Amino acid sequence: RVCRKAEEAAGLPVRPCYMYALTREGRKPPMVHVRQSLYSLLEPRKKRGNVVNLLGFFSPLVDDCELYDLLHQAGVKTIHEISACRDYEEYQTMSEANFNLVLHPEARFAAEDFHDRLKIPFIELTRLYQIDKIGSQYRAFGKVLGVTFDDQAAAESAQKAVDAFKAQYPETAFAVGECMNGDAFELSLALVRYGFKVPEIYGTITAENFIYIKQLAAISPETRAYSNMEPTMLYYDGENSGVNMAIGKDAAYYHQNCPNVMWNQDRQPYGYAGVRRLFEALTEAENRWEEQP
């Protein structure tokens, strides 16, 4: 009834989206429901073979993300992101996509709705910070599309940023939080594999990230994982943690006496560009910290 009255008043389609905090740990938490509702107004249209939708985030990818170029290599002419749509009509053109690319697991239900209602299939990619795994994922993606991507320059640029930071700050020991653009456990695994220490992680264990936890346990058994939802974290004392740099807003809160990178910007880091930008940001944060009087 409320939606109908709103439609009459605004002259625009309106859909309800319920935000129940108690569903946070359930099958369809609030952010999953929001993503699903965002696309519920799309109407069927004739499909175009050179159109792709990127699903998963409420803001676009960073503009130098190599994924755009790789899609163009595959013959894609138009890449839609809901946050970049200028008006309702452009939003409706998302129904013309040949397929959807799911970049965040919380958009999976939305992609399934696309498939059921609009007959648009989807492919899911994971945001990663391990350079070799990013390459493997792109190769698998290219195989599905029947193309071989040229991602060498982007991969080398990311590796160069990692190497430059490591050469300047080889003894960095990270605290990695979950309030940032990435999975805390996957990013921690990447940092350990790059040769850094990760004494502490603050994150929520899920089915998706358990594989990273198992790998971390094998190569960095001294790493400790904490839950931000645990009330006793109010008394957390990181003085003897060995941490000298923090990634994520929560990690920065726990470790206020060392340099940090919030890494929670609106434009979404992704792929090799995400790795490169992260290590450039880490280098900049360390440099600023050293320049303090």
What is each residue range found by the language model?
Residues R1-P293:
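An N-terminal assembly and electron-transfer interface module characteristic of large anaerobic redox
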